[in-house]
């Protein structure tokens, strides 16, 4: 491991940084992730997090990488061995965070699973999905991200080709929905109708 100093922070290798201050601007977008109402507002259309989605856990992150979603940032604890992540793309920032930073981000000083920020994939059109899909699920007013995650997980298990979700349904890429689906949401074609 190559260690060099960058300003007052330690850079463990290119694009991997040790963050000790919760006020560090590099982690500002992640502070308060445990406040789900605020996070959901930020993730809605027009919010600052709308072009991104958050994946938590090794399984979820690896599944997102398998279908070639672009990993932008990886937040890990001081002792996390990121060799468990199948591949870390070039240009991905890795923030190895102290307990105080992790507590500001998640509400807990310890982080068992990594947190990744990905670029949200483009949506297919209704015509593209319905033309090639044999089995489609339509959600109606599934507002709870946990329930949406279970819908995605079950849809993948039953070989569903596409999931259409109505305007009253929550985003299947909400952090909790992605986690509950165990990353199965990435194997489905989705469209907001």
Which positions does each model-derived feature cover?
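A glycine-rich helix N-cap at a beta->alpha junction
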Residues: 92-98
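RNA substrate-binding interface of SAM-dependent RNA methyltransferases
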Residues: 66, 122-191
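Glycine-rich phosphate-binding loops that contact phosphosugars or nucleotide phosphates
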Residues: 116
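Single conserved hydrophobic/aromatic residue that forms the stacking wall/gate
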Residues: 1-12, 191-192
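Short, aromatic/basic amphipathic alpha-helical patches
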Residues: 82-91
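Glycine/small-residue-rich loop that forms an oxyanion/phosphate-binding "nest" at active or ligand-binding sites
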Residues: 97, 103-106
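Boundary-proximal intrinsically disordered activation/regulatory segments immediately upstream
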Residues: 8, 13-78
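Alpha-helix capping/helix-boundary segments
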Residues: 59-61, 80-81, 100-102, 169-170
């Amino acid at each position: 491991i190559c260690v060099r100093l960058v300003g007052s922070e330690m850079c463990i290798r290119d694009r991997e940084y040790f963050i000790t201050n919760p006020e560090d601007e590099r982690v500002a977008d992640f502070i308060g992730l445990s406040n789900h109402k605020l996070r959901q507002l930020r993730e809605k259309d027009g919010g600052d997090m709308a072009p991104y989605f958050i994946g938590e856990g090794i399984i979820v992150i690896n599944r997102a990488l398998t279908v070639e979603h672009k990993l932008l940032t990886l937040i890990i604890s001081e002792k996390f061995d990121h060799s468990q992540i199948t591949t870390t793309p070039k240009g991905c920032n890795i923030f190895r965070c102290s307990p105080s930073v992790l507590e500001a981000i998640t509400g807990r000083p310890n982080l068992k699973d990594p947190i990744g920020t990905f670029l949200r994939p483009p949506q297919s059109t209704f015509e593209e999905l319905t033309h090639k899909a044999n089995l489609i699920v339509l959600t109606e007013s599934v507002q709870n991200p946990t329930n949406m995650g279970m819908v995605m997980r079950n849809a993948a298990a039953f070989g569903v080709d596409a999931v259409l979700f109505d305007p009253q349904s929550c985003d299947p890429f909400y952090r909790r929905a992605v986690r509950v689906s165990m990353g199965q949401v990435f194997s489905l074609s989705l469209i907001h109708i």
